[in-house]
Amino acid sequence: MSKDEHKLPLSKRKESIIFMMILFAFQVFMVVLFSVWVRYSKNEVNYSTLTPEQLQELEATGGVVQEEVTNIYGYFRDINIMIFFGFGFLMTFLRRYGYSALGYTFIISALVAQWSVLIYGFFETVDHKNDHGGDYASTFEMSQTVLLQGLFCAGAVMISYGAVLGRVTPLQMLVVGIFEPIFYFLNMFIGEMNLEAIDVGGGMYIHLFGSVFGLTIAWFLTDKKSKDCEDNSPSYTGDYFAMAGTLFLWMMWPSFNAAIAPLGEPQFRAIANTFLSLTASTIATFIVTRLFGHLGHKIDMVHVQNSSLAGGVVQGCLAHMNINPGGAIGMGFLAGVISVIGYLFISPFLQRRFNIQDTCGIHNLHFMPGFIGSIAACIAAWKGLNDRSLYNPIEFNQIFRAGEDQARNNAAATFISIGIAIAGGLFVGMILKALKKVGGLKAKQYYQDSAFWHVPIDYPKDVEYVVEQNNLPMPTTDNGDNVVGGGVEMKKHNNNNNKKENGYRRDLIRLLETLVRNEQSTDSSYSDSDSSDEEEKERRIRKLAKKSYRRSKKSHSEHQPQHQPEESTFNNNNNNNNNNATAETTDNGGSSTNSPTSKV
């Protein structure tokens, strides 16, 4: 291959240059502003006036700064693990998109963590002036809590990324990482700093906002080619890694909800309520996924990876409130049930009716549980205002900062969060759609690392490569554990057109039946089928084979077959006996170079 053939297309080179220039300019901008405006948090004491005893005590305790480090750093570490490891690995389920899921999570979260310090500092400075008057502060003190706010914002951006996973370029994700934090902290400025709404774990500001923002930009990036892409499917190994992300998120979620809760009883309640809610949502997930499971009450790994976390999301707003342990379990169970139902019914409806393709199902994991938790916080606030015996005087003032208006303010903040997320998503979505002209993904590059990453030799092969090697359509597995072969472009040639279409159709369907049987013989999901279902299985196999042929023929009708498969590929003994031909091909599928295997 010549040197020129290794070069990126012109549009991709433009995208790469623009990406690097923006990222470099951003970093220079950060260096300048952090140097000029940001200062470390420090103990507000006049050391010259302290007595030796006071200096010794300050040296031993570390003062206010050390107290904050002691109280917060453990949570800061756990949330770091959640953002960079948990969210990253949770999105590695796609068969050919692991590098991008982890890599984009890494770079964009790091960028957002820096950028958030400045944006939060700006709104904090404005709020301080509104409360205390005077001039704007010339510097901003960066504390451990400010760094924590940057991680929270990165979590919202990663939630939005889940909706468009596999359909964005690095440049598009960079735009999301720069603009979404602005809308995120604007929403916090209104809801947290002015309305003083209750939201200890980001149920509104992170989950609800991030999911609505992501679904809005997904509307701009959804097209027929991305919806029909064969690579928008999980792999067995990818699901392993995604489940690792789920487990880390599950274990660390109590820290996420308790990090900024008031010390003492409220912080303990935040940990306990979140943990109990997570256990309940996990139990609910296994119940509902088996109840509605494919092919005889089978467990769906997609549901386990995502819906088991819904209990942590639903507690986001009110985890530190006195809602009773039974209430926490009930909320978690309800969130788990609704999340699984969302994956089964609501996501397909959104894609079909509203043209919103939600790759990771953030609507089901973040939007619905987040909205339920936001409404529950309004109810809990109303109950707490009417029964003050639930809280001691200190924690009551810490939780109910808006006083008698707390329930109304929480309701207002909920819908303001949705409104700002939609407005911000529309603005950013239009930019992302315009950027599709600058190195945007082609139809064959959706859900593939190879578009922007160097990939190793064992990178999962492209469907067209498999077809080229076998001269036959390659079946894939859809969400229903069914084997299909639609959307495959077969390699053609111009020399062998003398056979009629009907004969080719018959042989191709016969081969597809064989491939389905091979897949079933090696797939444990079929190993426990009852013998009484053989007739139904045979009917389904033939139906799938015919459907695969029709889809392949319809999608690529302009092409002609490169060569006709040899008769021996389809029938090792007798061309007139379809059943014997299928059996022979199944038995000898691994011994002939011309017969495709069920594993490529």
UniProtKB/Swiss-Prot annotation:
<feature type="topological domain" description="Extracellular">
    <location>
        <begin position="192"/>
        <end position="199"/>
    </location>
</feature>
<dbReference type="InterPro" id="IPR029020">
    <property type="entry name" value="Ammonium/urea_transptr"/>
</dbReference>
<feature type="compositionally biased region" description="Basic and acidic residues">
    <location>
        <begin position="555"/>
        <end position="566"/>
    </location>
</feature>
<feature type="transmembrane region" description="Helical">
    <location>
        <begin position="146"/>
        <end position="166"/>
    </location>
</feature>
<dbReference type="GO" id="GO:0005886">
    <property type="term" value="C:plasma membrane"/>
</dbReference>
<dbReference type="InterPro" id="IPR024041">
    <property type="entry name" value="NH4_transpt_AmtB-like_dom"/>
</dbReference>
<feature type="transmembrane region" description="Helical">
    <location>
        <begin position="74"/>
        <end position="94"/>
    </location>
</feature>
<keyword id="KW-1133">Transmembrane helix</keyword>
<feature type="topological domain" description="Extracellular">
    <location>
        <begin position="383"/>
        <end position="411"/>
    </location>
</feature>
<keyword id="KW-0812">Transmembrane</keyword>
<feature type="transmembrane region" description="Helical">
    <location>
        <begin position="362"/>
        <end position="382"/>
    </location>
</feature>
<feature type="transmembrane region" description="Helical">
    <location>
        <begin position="241"/>
        <end position="261"/>
    </location>
</feature>
<feature type="transmembrane region" description="Helical">
    <location>
        <begin position="304"/>
        <end position="323"/>
    </location>
</feature>
<protein>
    <recommendedName>
        <fullName>Rhesus-like glycoprotein B</fullName>
    </recommendedName>
</protein>
<feature type="topological domain" description="Extracellular">
    <location>
        <begin position="324"/>
        <end position="325"/>
    </location>
</feature>
<dbReference type="InterPro" id="IPR002229">
    <property type="entry name" value="RhesusRHD"/>
</dbReference>
<feature type="topological domain" description="Cytoplasmic">
    <location>
        <begin position="1"/>
        <end position="16"/>
    </location>
</feature>
<feature type="topological domain" description="Cytoplasmic">
    <location>
        <begin position="347"/>
        <end position="361"/>
    </location>
</feature>
<keyword id="KW-0325">Glycoprotein</keyword>
<feature type="region of interest" description="Disordered">
    <location>
        <begin position="471"/>
        <end position="600"/>
    </location>
</feature>
<feature type="transmembrane region" description="Helical">
    <location>
        <begin position="171"/>
        <end position="191"/>
    </location>
</feature>
<feature type="transmembrane region" description="Helical">
    <location>
        <begin position="275"/>
        <end position="295"/>
    </location>
</feature>
<feature type="topological domain" description="Cytoplasmic">
    <location>
        <begin position="296"/>
        <end position="303"/>
    </location>
</feature>
<keyword id="KW-0472">Membrane</keyword>
<feature type="topological domain" description="Cytoplasmic">
    <location>
        <begin position="167"/>
        <end position="170"/>
    </location>
</feature>
<feature type="transmembrane region" description="Helical">
    <location>
        <begin position="103"/>
        <end position="123"/>
    </location>
</feature>
<feature type="compositionally biased region" description="Polar residues">
    <location>
        <begin position="581"/>
        <end position="600"/>
    </location>
</feature>
<comment type="similarity">
    <text>Belongs to the ammonium transporter (TC 2.A.49) family. Rh subfamily.</text>
</comment>
<feature type="transmembrane region" description="Helical">
    <location>
        <begin position="200"/>
        <end position="220"/>
    </location>
</feature>
<comment type="function">
    <text>May be a carbon dioxide/bicarbonate transporter.</text>
</comment>
<feature type="topological domain" description="Cytoplasmic">
    <location>
        <begin position="95"/>
        <end position="102"/>
    </location>
</feature>
<feature type="compositionally biased region" description="Basic and acidic residues">
    <location>
        <begin position="498"/>
        <end position="510"/>
    </location>
</feature>
<feature type="transmembrane region" description="Helical">
    <location>
        <begin position="326"/>
        <end position="346"/>
    </location>
</feature>
<feature type="transmembrane region" description="Helical">
    <location>
        <begin position="17"/>
        <end position="37"/>
    </location>
</feature>
<feature type="compositionally biased region" description="Low complexity">
    <location>
        <begin position="519"/>
        <end position="529"/>
    </location>
</feature>
<feature type="glycosylation site" description="N-linked (GlcNAc...) asparagine">
    <location>
        <position position="46"/>
    </location>
</feature>
<feature type="compositionally biased region" description="Low complexity">
    <location>
        <begin position="571"/>
        <end position="580"/>
    </location>
</feature>
<feature type="compositionally biased region" description="Basic residues">
    <location>
        <begin position="540"/>
        <end position="554"/>
    </location>
</feature>
<dbReference type="Pfam" id="PF00909">
    <property type="entry name" value="Ammonium_transp"/>
</dbReference>
<dbReference type="GO" id="GO:0072488">
    <property type="term" value="P:ammonium transmembrane transport"/>
</dbReference>
<feature type="topological domain" description="Extracellular">
    <location>
        <begin position="38"/>
        <end position="73"/>
    </location>
</feature>
<dbReference type="GO" id="GO:0097272">
    <property type="term" value="P:ammonium homeostasis"/>
</dbReference>
